[in-house]
Amino acid sequence: MSPAAAPAAAATAATVAPATATTVAAPSAFDLVADRARAGSYGPDPAGLRIALAFTTAQAVRHAGRAQGYRNEVLSLRLDAAVGSCAVEPGELPAGALDDCVGARVDELLDHPLAAVRVAALDAYLGHCRPHTSARGARTLTLPAGSSLEKSRARAAAVVRLLPLAEVRRVLVVGVVNSLLEQLRSSGAEYLPCDLKGGVTEWGEPVHADALARLDDCDAILASGMTLGNGTLDPLLAHARTTGKPLVLFAQTGSAVLPRLLGDGVSAVSAEPYPFFWLDGGPTDLHLYGGGAR
């Protein structure tokens, strides 16, 4: 299923501000980090760097013993040794997207009309300038070799440990990943599963299509990095900033971008740059930031 929060409903009535007041919308999470990148806060000028390689990865999976499967498609851009990625709905990318990226300057791609290109470009840039190292706060965990299901469960255990479960009653899960729900169940945690596509979980629980409508029913939020790619991260961030609720992100999309939001609404990140666990039966790495008991 596509991990995503549903867009907020439009207001039914406008509030007119006084003539002397100016209302300025807060920048989106993407714009906040991208503007810092353009200003040189993270390293070299993006205008001086070009993407050498663009590719997509598509997969379909249904693990043994599971009643449900899913499909994924990911756009990835390579900048020197770094690969930046953004998941998309299968078939969503237009035919010319890869050609747009190859040889293009990073600063140009940060303004590309496709959100997936913008996110993948920023992710590649930050993966190049801010790799996941202990000096930058990352705790690298190597997932052991195994089947896709074994590695999925190992990743889920690491991600769930980033939540302060002893302090929360119910977790809003934005992006249905069965191994994460399975880990929460085994931890005794209550959860509210949410995904734009709705449906039911592996255990027959209803999946809520509108995550924003359930924000007041949770004590913590566990969300996929795909929310950065489809633009639905911002209301989750706003809620976490306002309420102080833990917001933990598990990210293949934007894995180098989302750690830049730690302390600004985000309490922990599991960052998983390409190649992802499902591509390789051997050991692969997660980079963990923040998290645990507060």
Residue ranges, per PLM feature:
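Structural motif
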Residues: 170, 219-220
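C-terminal functional extensions of proteins
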Residues: 245-294
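Short, conserved loop/helix-junction motifs that constitute active-site signature segments
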Residues: 166, 215-216, 238-244
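Short acidic low-complexity segments
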Residues: 205-217
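NAD(P)-binding Rossmann-fold cofactor-contacting core
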Residues: 188-201
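A short helix->loop->beta-strand "cap" motif at the edges of active sites that frequently abuts
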Residues: 188-189, 242-246
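A short acidic, amphipathic alpha-helical/loop segment
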Residues: 183-184, 232-239, 260-261
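Electropositive, gly/pro-rich neighborhoods at or near active sites that engage anionic ligands
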Residues: 2-5, 21-178, 284
